[in-house]
């Protein structure tokens, strides 16, 4: 019998993080899934690391050449998917245990694409800067939604097509895919739960030269061992604002929090987003260089 969900994990030469991302899938309360770990022409020990996990639901696939972005690994995952629902997980990201159950529930209630709130962790000299994204319910065309936070019906990509190559686009491939799905009148539903954690490589200089996993290890341990991890993280992020705005009405506080979350995140990644006049795909190439990867030929 085919699984309900196909989880696609695109990866490239960063094997140390895979036990943590894959482990967060294996700890899901919803267990009817397969996991396709798709290497983008990996040349390191990623295959051996995946096989050592030893779960029959996990399949290793490696593309013959490096394509430079998650689009083609995701497309290969879509081609080999057996599930009626598709979930994506960045190889250096983590899911909370209720991620699939929350989003699959929304799909079973009629959504075509569901997404939860993701905690972005940007490392700074004095610790983490935390942002939740998205901070509002309604999808708007062009809105950024991290693939790690998305589950959609396989019929969506069957109809609108898969992931486009970044050099064909003036925007990012994930933003392009969500916009095409929305334009085709598929129903988007926001699930107001914190369901995933993202460690954006585009905000970590030379991370692909260092290939660390200490952040994923520490946060994975917290997720597993801290009771009430989700509300605790919400409180940790909101409390500094409470001290500053304790005299303000709740609605004002919430509005300010949403605005700060969006503004703060965008300020830190704006230098990685290409202006319209730049060549197609140039922002992805800039991200690659910042992360410690060479520009693609």
Placement of each model-derived feature along the sequence:
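N-proximal low-complexity "stem/linker" segments adjacent to membrane-targeting elements
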Residues: 1-24
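Short, acidic, metal-binding catalytic loop of nucleotide-sugar glycosyltransferases
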Residues: 23-32
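A conserved acidic beta->alpha catalytic loop
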Residues: 39-48, 65-67, 90, 96
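Glycine-rich, basic loop-to-helix element that forms the pyrophosphate-binding segment
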Residues: 63-81
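Short aromatic/hydrophobic "clamp" motif used to bind/position activated sugar donors
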Residues: 86
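Conserved donor NDP-sugar-binding/catalytic core segment of glycosyltransferases
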Residues: 94, 98-128
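Short, flexible, basic/aromatic active-site loop/helix in glycosyltransferases
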Residues: 117, 124-147
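Conserved nucleotide-sugar donor-binding catalytic segment
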Residues: 136-220
């Amino acid at each position: 019998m085919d699984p309900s969900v196909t989880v696609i994990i695109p990866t490239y030469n960063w094997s140390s993080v895979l036990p943590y991302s894959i482990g967060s899938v294996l700890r899901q309360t919803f267990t009817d899934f397969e996991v396709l770990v798709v290497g983008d022409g990996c040349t390191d020990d990623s295959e051996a690391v995946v096989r050592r996990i030893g779960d029959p639901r996990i399949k290793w696939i490696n593309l013959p050449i490096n394509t430079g972005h998650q689009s083609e690994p995701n497309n290969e995952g879509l081609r080999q998917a057996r599930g009626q629902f598709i979930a994506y997980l960045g190889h250096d990201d983590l899911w909370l245990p209720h991620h699939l159950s929350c989003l699959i529930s929304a799909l079973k209630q009629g959504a075509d694409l569901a997404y939860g709130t993701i905690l972005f962790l940007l490392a700074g000299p004095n610790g983490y800067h935390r942002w939740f994204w998205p901070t509002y319910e309604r999808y708007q065309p062009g809105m950024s939604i991290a693939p790690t936070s998305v589950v959609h019906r396989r019929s969506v990509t069957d109809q609108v097509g898969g992931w486009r190559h970044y050099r064909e686009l003036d925007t990012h491939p994930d933003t392009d895919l969500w916009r095409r799905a929305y334009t085709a009148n598929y129903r988007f539903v926001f699930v107001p739960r914190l369901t995933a954690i993202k460690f954006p490589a585009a905000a970590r200089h030379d991370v692909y030269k260092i290939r660390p996993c200490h952040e994923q290890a520490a946060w994975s341990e917290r997720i597993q061992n801290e009771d009430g991890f989700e509300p605790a993280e919400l409180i940790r992020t909101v409390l500094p604002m409470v001290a500053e705005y304790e005299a303000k009405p709740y609605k004002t506080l919430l509005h300010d929090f949403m605005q700060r979350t969006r503004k703060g995140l965008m300020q830190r990644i704006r230098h990685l987003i290409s202006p319209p006049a730049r060549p197609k795909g140039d922002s992805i190439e800039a991200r690659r260089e910042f992360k410690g990867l060479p520009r693609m030929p």
